[in-house]
């Protein structure tokens, strides 16, 4: 089922008549030597896609891959946004689609 916004044309989105959107929120931070730094994003996005495939009219918004992870500052290459920037990204994302669909977050 074609429901991933970033893989669709504007025409396909319009024809799909989406009424709901799910946004996965992850991170890119250290999880030890055995798990990818992006596992939070990968799991949240996979679940979002599985949910959307089961719910009529649900669109999958591209994942938000970096969030507030200041508690991982001591680990190399853990990416973080400031708290205020994280809130601003979430707010702006919501504002972009709020008038068109019901929004569901998955983290």
Predicted features along the sequence, with ranges:
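N-terminal catalytic or cofactor-binding beta/alpha core of small enzyme domains
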Residues: 1-103
